[in-house]
């Protein structure tokens, strides 16, 4: 069966779907801190982050923290301040969101003793200009994790009223997290320096061995610094239920590739391809397979190229696989396509020369030989948006 990239599917869907069934976008705002203690601001960020991640894990499109923070900055809004309904609407419109989840919390009791939290939230439907009833909860502060799951369930049920998923199933799939670990993780997300972020994420991971989110952040932190073995050690601990799981698997595949573990890289990319069949995943899967001299590499490079024929990386890799198979004339056409898009590409020039001279490939271990090119960025949003659009059409 022929497979298509997310971008190809999205283009095709535009001809099938009307605006009424386009995927809906959701945003969760940081909850206002009514406790008059700025040391508790992290609670408002925690509610926002965890509800957003829970909804995302259920397949809903939820805008990320960076987008929301940028709008707050542009509108000169203070994080964790109580917003009027009019301001909430303006934030949602600035983010082009269909639904906004917002609310506030208060904490009672002495810091040195047992404290309780009261949480209240609503879902605002911007397309119909109506909002849900208020969801409110009161519990000991140490039960914050379970309160967040309860709120996420209410929001999910409001946004997906026809869901067949039960509340018990929804909650069982989410492990409780120690509140001190959660606090360190959230403080890490908002920390001003990279060193502080790393220290707080590491502390969160140490406090709760089953806490997946800081493990993803630590893996990404080390990947960005080319500490590939340490990155791989963290990334392989990210739980399958974590909304960052596929991004973690992508970075894990890249880390293993850089470490020369091509079988492990192939395993990671193949796992993602089964869920999110997008260009960059097929490309990197093909690269790992090419390093193992597997014939499937060419097929996956061609799948990536089908999704975006304007990308010189995909043309290069198709040419590389054909050259290794001794298909010099066809490979030369691929390298010419690369040079049509980037005339100053030295590797493509070298490989075209080898094809014209009919120079055969040497050992895969030859470091002087140009190898397949990787994609470093993974974006599943377009594919998930398409999936959401098609699900909406079924309803």
Where are these regions (language model features)?
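Short beta-strand->alpha-helix linker/helix-N-cap micro-motif
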Residues: 24-90, 94, 98-113, 130-133, ...
